[in-house]
């Protein structure tokens, strides 16, 4: 058995082994504000699907990120993550991020007056439908994938690992996870 769980490198590793992994690195953007006085440390994570935003408390600051529908492909010249790349950043593209930041002001008005401490633009792996890729690939028996978490890998890893192990051991799973099955493509 083989489990491919290599994040944004999964597609090109799949290509190198004759397996199609529909996952692509795209630019992912977020900002971290300057410290905000009296910001609750137990603030819930806010996900605004209408405006493609997520917001969360980050050590007394707010992190505002986006999962936009029209993302910018990363490494578009080669369509491959460079072999020497190690979670670096891309040049700032505030023009792309600004409309989303402005939309966040209606959700959390105090953001309008908050300073920006950090602007981040870096690669993250995304699938065409933004759902995770799990299961046995159609091209190679006993070759499983567990990737394409679109920035939610840490939170999903335990359950995805459990399901992948069950799939490998039993040849099937109890849950209906077709929306995540790599064979949906």
Segments from the language model and where they lie:
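Flavin-dependent oxidoreductases
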Residues: 1-78, 82-91, 99-110
């Amino acid at each position: 058995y083989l489990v491919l769980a290599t994040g944004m490198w999964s597609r090109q590793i799949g290509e190198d082994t004759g397996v199609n992994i529909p996952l692509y690195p795209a630019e992912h953007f977020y900002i971290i504000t300057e410290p905000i006085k009296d910001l609750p440390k137990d603030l819930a994570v806010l996900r605004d699907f209408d405006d493609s935003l997520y917001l969360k408390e980050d050590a007394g600051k707010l992190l505002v990120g986006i999962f936009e529908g029209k993302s910018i492909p990363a490494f578009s010249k080669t369509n491959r993550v460079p072999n020497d790349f190690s979670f670096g950043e891309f040049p700032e593209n505030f023009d792309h991020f600004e409309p989303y930041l402005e939309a966040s002001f209606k959700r959390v008005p105090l953001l309008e007056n908050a300073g920006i401490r950090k602007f981040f633009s870096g690669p993250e792996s995304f699938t065409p439908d933004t759902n995770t890729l799990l299961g046995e690939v159609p091209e190679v028996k006993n070759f499983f994938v567990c990737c394409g978490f679109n920035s939610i890998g840490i939170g999903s890893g335990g359950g995805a690992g459990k399901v992948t192990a069950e799939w490998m051991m039993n040849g099937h799973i109890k849950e209906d996870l077709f929306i995540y099955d790599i064979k949906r493509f």
